[in-house]
Amino acid sequence: MNQSGTNQSSLSDSNQAGINQPSTNSLGMNQMDMNQGSASLYEMNQVDMKQPSMSQAGMRQSGTNLPDINQPDMKQPDTWQLGRSQPGMLQQELSQLVLSKAGISQPDPSQPGPSQSGPSQSRMRQIGTNQSGMSQPVMQQLDSQSGGSQPSMRQVGTSQLGTSQIGMSQPGTWQTGLSQPVLRQPNMSPPGMWQPGVQQPGISQQVPSHPDMSQPGMSQQVPSQPGIRQPDTSQSCKNQTDMSQPDANQSSLSDSNQTGIIQPSPSLLGMNQMDMNQWSASLYEMNQVDMKQPSMSQAGMRQSGTNLPDINQPGMKQPGTWQLGRSQPGMWPQSLSELVLSEASISQPGPPQRAPSQSGPRQSSTSQAGTNQSGISQPVMWQLDMRQSGGSQPSMRQVGTSQSGTSQIGMSQPGTWQTGLSQPVPRQPNKSPPGMWQRGMWQPGMSQQVPSQLGMRQPGTSQSSKNQTGMSHPGRGQPGIWEPGPSQPGLSQQDLNQLVLSQPGLSQPGRSQPSVSQMGMRQTSMDYFQIRHAEAGDCPEILRLIKELAACENMLDAMELTAADLLRDGFGDNPLFYCLIAEVNDQQKPSGKLTVGFAMYYFTYDSWTGKVLYLEDFYVTQAYQGLGIGAEMLKRLSQIAITTQCNCMHFLVVIWNQASINYYTSRGALDLSSEEGWHLFRFNREELLDMAWEE
């Protein structure tokens, strides 16, 4: 283990106050067999949080009891404890979760979890990787040089299975184990990058770590990000013996240590937040006041520009939730195809253990390891722009994987992939950055939805995920997710029903969050206007509206009716007509109401069809037209006609009122004048008198 120039003080020196990592090897610890049985994170987790048997992430510890892994009192037998997971510890067939946080590229799962890509990771070039033109800020050591990893450690012969750094084309590498069904993301890579062979069906990547384990022929094709050629992909991180990394001062956790950061579980840290000061990345300080996020605060949730701390709204308990973020990379079930955490812009091709790794307190613009592409992320699978922090890549459905339950952080249920959570509309075709088309990325079968947190803004929606300031409902315990209020207008997720993980009573899956009143949308229901049957006292108002209508039809001179006539004929023992009245609230009126419309009707008879409802007048004051009042009145009239056994409704429209003609026609009314050739005639009183008295 020749680590020239690299300071690797053990974890004990890592300034993480309060973090006692009894059994954990120094970051750089080259774990030959990766057999880190009980390298428990013991107290590595949040202060007071004991994770006794916490197996290195990625390391499938069947039978290990991860009692307090991230969730106090939570037993997670048999779980893939992602947490603190040591990327390199992936089990056989565990698809290469690859890529961890920016700067912390943990391609080869080799880097034991704690590895914190120290602030000085920048400019670390991976020897052997031809990064033509690929400037990887904080260039993750392709070899999984995540932070504390042993810069000089070189794993001879180990072909770097899981590095997948954007732009790194690893031709010929066929990552066994990735088994990425249907992963096929033709144009997934950044614009111009073509990843033809990304398919990786049925491959089984055997413990990529094991130095010297060079798996001949095993080339990691998937992660291969076109652009960078890694001819031999030999670059296995773990043992980079000669890989001196100039300037990479990796004093294990100590240098990379962020003051005040308790890196209890891999979570939190994993949250690569561009421009985000991850000062208190640890769950502890990370939690807002009163916020208990035992399981890992929304790690993985990319919150550009937001402080992790605010991620959790004060008082909000998020116990045991897959806080999308940081979806325990290591937690992926065996055979789970490379989900790619992909945190917006944080291309995380593989579930790389980004957790512990925090590249410097400030991870500004550190795009995920390997993802040096500013803005582009995760060629391979990652839903560009999807910001689907956490493994949940809507479009990425992994075939057959099921992840039942919400799986609390760290509690990855091996083999299960959150079935119930299936993210509706996973298919988000145009989510990726312009030009990047993720066709085929669908990965049928896997309904990986978990990560989807309501509050989590999907494609294009910034929604600093869980932090919507002001959006938080303090004290609202949403185990699992922050659903930005039911009516978060800006949050509306196009087509994405943003299913909520387990928001009891909080948000209904599939429910779009605009409020019922759609903010700004005119209320056209009864809370704005009321429609009722007219009473005797309404006669003056009815007369006023009749005159307005007559004036509109240029027939005001023909108006002879009085309020007394209306009272006598419409409100006696045998009414000759009936009226519906439309009112709106008006505080200036003594009654508090203003009559803005009416409909006068009566019943007649047709010798061919029977009873008919005849609509004599139908009018809404012009200032209140267009609010749905007329449509509601027409609906009421139709209901009356049906309940009174009428077979049709007749009415007249003046010939020059084309707007009304068009409206009624669009609703299905027939113009009998043209359809059947009828003419409406009328005898006035004089003619009636003449006829009545003629001899």
Curated annotation (Swiss-Prot):
Protein name: Spermidine/spermine N(1)-acetyltransferase-like protein 1
Domain of life: Eukaryota
Gene3D superfamilies in the record: 3.40.630.30
Species per Swiss-Prot/TrEMBL record: Homo sapiens
Residue stretches of biased makeup (Low complexity): 105-122
Enzyme kind, highest EC tier: transferase
Similarity annotation: Belongs to the acetyltransferase family.
InterPro entries: Acyl_CoA_acyltransferase, Diverse_Substrate_AcTransf, GNAT_dom
Keywords: Acyltransferase, Transferase
Binding site for substrate: C552, E553, H650, F651, L652, E676
